[in-house]
């Protein structure tokens, strides 16, 4: 879920997999489509969708997402490169957790039994994200650290 570099990298590195990438912003979809064409990546389908709305009835072995997870009051939003990004791509309500929780809950209907959900999140959100996974019924929940030793990606497995 999201059409940026992660989806294109997955498709490029795993030509044996079919990747479906979604984004609600038309400009992001158009850019990803141009990049996929420029890079000659054939195993990716890029759709405009508000999370799962265009994916009704489909089931996936794995869902990977880099959703908005920054608190709208975070002072870093006024610094560095993020100043040039659309806020809707960065900011989520409820201390940055609203979209994460939504994806965790909605992914249960979109995963095959035993399928994986992987979510990037803020470096201080690991515990809250793990708890959201567990409360939603996911198993084998774990958080991976980035190169700066910060909790950055949480994954879990959901059984129907």
Where are these regions (language model features)?
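Conserved SAM/SAH cofactor-binding pocket of Class I
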Residues: 1-76
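Residue-level signal for inorganic ion chemistry
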Residues: 6, 32, 66, 81, ...
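Short, well-ordered coil/turn elements that cap or connect secondary structure elements
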Residues: 14, 41, 85, 135-138
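Residue-level signal for the nucleotide or nucleotide-sugar donor/cofactor binding architecture
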Residues: 27, 31, 65, 85, ...
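Mobile active-site "lid"/loop adjacent to the S-adenosyl-L-methionine
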Residues: 69-99
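Short loop segments at secondary-structure junctions
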Residues: 73, 158-160
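Conserved Class I SAM-dependent methyltransferase catalytic core
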Residues: 94-158
């Amino acid at each position: 879920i999201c059409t940026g570099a992660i989806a294109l990298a997955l498709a490029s590195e795993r030509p044996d997999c079919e990747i479906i990438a979604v984004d609600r912003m038309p400009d992001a979809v158009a850019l990803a489509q141009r990049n996929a064409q420029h890079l000659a990546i054939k195993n990716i389908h890029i759709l405009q969708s508000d999370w799962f709305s265009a994916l009704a009835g489909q089931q996936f072995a794995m869902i990977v997402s880099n959703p908005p997870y920054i608190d709208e009051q975070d002072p870093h939003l006024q610094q560095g490169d993020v100043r040039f990004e659309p806020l809707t791509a960065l900011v989520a309500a409820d201390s940055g957790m609203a979209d994460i929780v939504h994806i965790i809950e909605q992914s249960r209907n979109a995963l095959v039994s035993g399928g994986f959900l992987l979510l990037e999140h803020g470096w201080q959100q690991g515990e809250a994200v793990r708890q959201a996974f567990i409360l939603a019924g996911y198993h084998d929940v774990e958080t991976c650290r980035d190169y700066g030793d910060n909790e950055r990606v949480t994954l879990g497995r959901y059984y129907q």
